[in-house]
Amino acid sequence: MSDVADRVKKIVVEHLGVEEDKVTENASFIDDLGADSLDTVELVMAFEEEFGIEIPDDAAETIQTFGDAVKFISEAS
């Protein structure tokens, strides 16, 4: 797993209180990991802070899974 993926996974585990093994590439934040809309906003803010990037609202709406987050952040960093 890449450094970006490790850091994203740590944020997801901390913010959603889920087990690490539940955070898989295709795991949906809402459907699989129990996040609500506020959780997803907080995750995006945490990703922005951790990686020093800005995630526009239209892009944030496309980040639905762990894999989506890793891909977006990898390309933006």
Curated annotation (Swiss-Prot):
<dbReference type="GO" id="GO:0009245">
    <property type="term" value="P:lipid A biosynthetic process"/>
</dbReference>
<dbReference type="GO" id="GO:0000036">
    <property type="term" value="F:acyl carrier activity"/>
</dbReference>
<keyword id="KW-0276">Fatty acid metabolism</keyword>
<keyword id="KW-0597">Phosphoprotein</keyword>
<dbReference type="GO" id="GO:0016020">
    <property type="term" value="C:membrane"/>
</dbReference>
<dbReference type="GO" id="GO:0005829">
    <property type="term" value="C:cytosol"/>
</dbReference>
<keyword id="KW-0444">Lipid biosynthesis</keyword>
<feature type="domain" description="Carrier">
    <location>
        <begin position="2"/>
        <end position="77"/>
    </location>
</feature>
<comment type="function">
    <text>Carrier of the growing fatty acid chain in fatty acid biosynthesis.</text>
</comment>
<comment type="similarity">
    <text>Belongs to the acyl carrier protein (ACP) family.</text>
</comment>
<keyword id="KW-0596">Phosphopantetheine</keyword>
<keyword id="KW-0963">Cytoplasm</keyword>
<dbReference type="InterPro" id="IPR003231">
    <property type="entry name" value="ACP"/>
</dbReference>
<dbReference type="GO" id="GO:0000035">
    <property type="term" value="F:acyl binding"/>
</dbReference>
<keyword id="KW-0275">Fatty acid biosynthesis</keyword>
<dbReference type="InterPro" id="IPR006162">
    <property type="entry name" value="Ppantetheine_attach_site"/>
</dbReference>
<protein>
    <recommendedName>
        <fullName>Acyl carrier protein</fullName>
    </recommendedName>
</protein>
<dbReference type="InterPro" id="IPR036736">
    <property type="entry name" value="ACP-like_sf"/>
</dbReference>
<feature type="modified residue" description="O-(pantetheine 4'-phosphoryl)serine">
    <location>
        <position position="37"/>
    </location>
</feature>
<dbReference type="Pfam" id="PF00550">
    <property type="entry name" value="PP-binding"/>
</dbReference>
<keyword id="KW-0443">Lipid metabolism</keyword>
<comment type="pathway">
    <text>Lipid metabolism; fatty acid biosynthesis.</text>
</comment>
<dbReference type="InterPro" id="IPR009081">
    <property type="entry name" value="PP-bd_ACP"/>
</dbReference>
